[in-house]
Amino acid sequence: MSDPRTPTPDTPVEATTAPTLHRPVHPVRFVTAASLFDGHDASINIMRRILQSQGVEVIHLGHNRSVDEVVDAAVQEDVQGVAVSSYQGGHNEYFRYLVDRLRARGAGHVQVFGGGCGVIIPSEIAALQAYGVARIFSPQDGQALGLPAMVNELVAACDVDLADHLPADLDALLSGDHTTLARVITGIEAGRLPEHQLAELRAAAARRRVPVLGITGTGGSGKSSLTDELIRRFRLDHEDKLSIAVIAVDPTRRRGGGALLGDRIRMNALDPSDRGGAVYFRSLATRTATTVPPGIDDIVAATKAAGADLVIVETPAIDQGDAAVVDH
């Protein structure tokens, strides 16, 4: 009689050694989501939690997200990677279109990762990776590697410094280009934007009288819901002729350095910016112990210079420190 503990061909293969976790050298940002018509979000929720614990700033969109929503988030948030789970059977079309749209928006550098358990068969995985998807993980990968090693691969592959690729000039930003605005904000966050460009931004912003609205409050008080409703009403009342910029700040975790940038998931009034959308939305991690990140004044100036008629700054909820937004 065989020993029931003896492995068989059907026995899952477990990772034998714990991987050495890759701690990001640069700020790594990811958009995570479950694909359109897909309500299976348990796996992507697990992945985004592990990403966050490993020091990644995660913009989580939740489930049932279209390619345009994912791409617009990737462009405006200036991320290095996108991670999507797809269990609904349309993965071939979805991932190909995702790669195509990123390239069309000037974000071909964004690496796309995905998974769909046994729904995505090996031949489809090979075809999608040949098309431009960085990696589709299979059930066998999960058995052999384990979740930490899988996430490790994502983090290591995307640990690149986007501030090394700043625009040579601000012409595109001053014309309202969201892709350039996103990269300029990345440069400001890193303290890498050249001083002459900062001076140009500040001068361009000073020429325009743009109101800045700060939204703050305790956790769960409805800050993001209020922001979304304000966006919706401004868009309706002004027939999308008003350009709005939203800067949403969330705290960085003290342990691990990651952050869940969860305000965008509550926004229902955003439209893809390449299809007439009048809203630029950027999530920021504090990266310090303060409620308002360093460089916020120049980030607001950049949105004004890019044509924003109204700037909304939403702070994290951390006791009385919320009042710090008044100074900006």
Segment roles from a protein language model:
Residues 38, 218-221:
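ATP-binding Walker
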Residues 1-5, 10-28:
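Non-catalytic signal-transmission and effector/linker regions of two-component phosphorelay proteins
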Residues 213-215:
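Hydrophobic anchor at the beta1->P-loop junction of P-loop NTPases
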Residues 37, 44-54, 58-150:
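Cofactor-cradling patches in redox/metallo enzymes
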Residues 189-210, 221, 226, 230-325:
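Nucleotide-state-sensitive switch-loop elements of NTP-binding domains
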Residues 34, 217, 248:
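The Walker A (P-loop) glycine that initiates the GxxxxGKT/S ATP-binding motif of P-loop NTPases
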Residues 16-17, 147-211:
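Extreme N-terminal, non-catalytic leader segments
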Residues 27, 105-115, 306-313, 328:
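Short beta-strand/loop segments at the ligand-binding rim of alpha/beta enzyme cores
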